[in-house]
């Protein structure tokens, strides 16, 4: 089994990259993919860059060149669920775009033309993540993660997203694009991110302060998932 792991930023991948044994690096179109093993599991770790286009391009390169059996999208997110605080975990049931709008043609808010309204995470991978959350005794929410090419920092965009997607648990800038590409390739995926900020008018300051915390927590989760997969063989 080979596991694809995707993070957008250097801070989101560095702790995992440092663990990779027999590491080799593939550089293509601004993306970096690190291949090797973590705890005996074959991995391909992508640093995609920030935003939907970078995430989509990087995920495509990862799936084409490395052919992982599954994908885990890791990193940080802004928490919208009321129970989430910095360092907590959010696990995707599904991912949607919050900045796509072709409703004039009968599509749902966030739905791209010709695509499903949401990209649904793999049930077995959700269960794997939840078992690791229980094992690590972490606080977590499972639900909808919304993505867009904007850092949500202010009352107006926050209110718009909550009004359009009332059950949204977290927001960030890549997960829906990752899910979109995995859907097209037929590759199972799950998003497992740690909260770096609670999306509000001060979230930019919280993000800068707590990104390191989120990176450590999301890495902890990915490691636990890899360890469980290694035990299963």
Swiss-Prot record:
The protein, known as: 5'-methylthioadenosine/S-adenosylhomocysteine nucleosidase
Pathway assigned in UniProt: Amino-acid biosynthesis; L-methionine biosynthesis via salvage pathway; S-methyl-5-thio-alpha-D-ribose 1-phosphate from S-methyl-5'-thioadenosine (hydrolase route): step 1/2
Gene Ontology CC annotation, any one: cytosol
Claim: Amino-acid biosynthesis is one of the keywords in the record: yes
NCBIfam families membership: MTA_SAH-Nsdase, PRK05584.1
Function statement: Catalyzes the irreversible cleavage of the glycosidic bond in both 5'-methylthioadenosine (MTA) and S-adenosylhomocysteine (SAH/AdoHcy) to adenine and the corresponding thioribose, 5'-methylthioribose and S-ribosylhomocysteine, respectively. Also cleaves 5'-deoxyadenosine, a toxic by-product of radical S-adenosylmethionine (SAM) enzymes, into 5-deoxyribose and adenine. Thus, is required for in vivo function of the radical SAM enzymes biotin synthase and lipoic acid synthase, that are inhibited by 5'-deoxyadenosine accumulation.
Positions bound to substrate: 78, 152, 173-174
Recorded name of the encoding gene: mtnN
Molecular functions per Gene Ontology: adenosylhomocysteine nucleosidase activity; methylthioadenosine nucleosidase activity
Family annotation (Pfam families): PNP_UDP_1
Organism: Serratia proteamaculans (strain 568)
Subunit note: Homodimer.
């Amino acid at each position: 089994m080979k596991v694809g792991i995707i993070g957008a930023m250097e801070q989101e991948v560095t702790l995992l990259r440092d663990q990779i044994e027999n590491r080799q690096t593939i550089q293509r179109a601004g993306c970096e993919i690190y291949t090797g093993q973590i705890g005996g599991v074959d991995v391909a770790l992508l640093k995609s860059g920030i935003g939907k286009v970078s995430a989509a391009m990087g995920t495509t390169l990862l799936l084409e060149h490395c052919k992982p059996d599954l994908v885990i999208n890791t990193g940080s997110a802004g928490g919208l669920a009321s129970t989430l605080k910095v360092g907590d975990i959010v696990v995707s049931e599904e991912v949607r775009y919050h900045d796509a709008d072709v409703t004039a043609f009968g599509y749902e808010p966030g739905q791209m033309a010709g695509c499903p309204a949401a990209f649904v995470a793999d049930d077995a991978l959700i269960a794997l993540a939840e078992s690791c959350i229980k094992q690590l005794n972490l606080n977590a929410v499972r639900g909808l993660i919304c993505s867009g090419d904007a850092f949500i920092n202010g009352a107006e965009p926050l209110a718009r997203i909550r009004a359009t997607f009332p059950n949204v648990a977290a927001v960030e800038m890549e997960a829906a694009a990752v899910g979109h590409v995995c859907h097209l390739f037929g590759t199972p995926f799950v998003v497992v991110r740690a909260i770096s900020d609670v999306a509000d008018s001060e979230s930019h300051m919280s993000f800068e302060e707590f990104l390191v915390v989120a990176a450590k927590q999301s890495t902890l989760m990915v490691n636990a998932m890899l360890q469980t997969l290694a035990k299963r063989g």
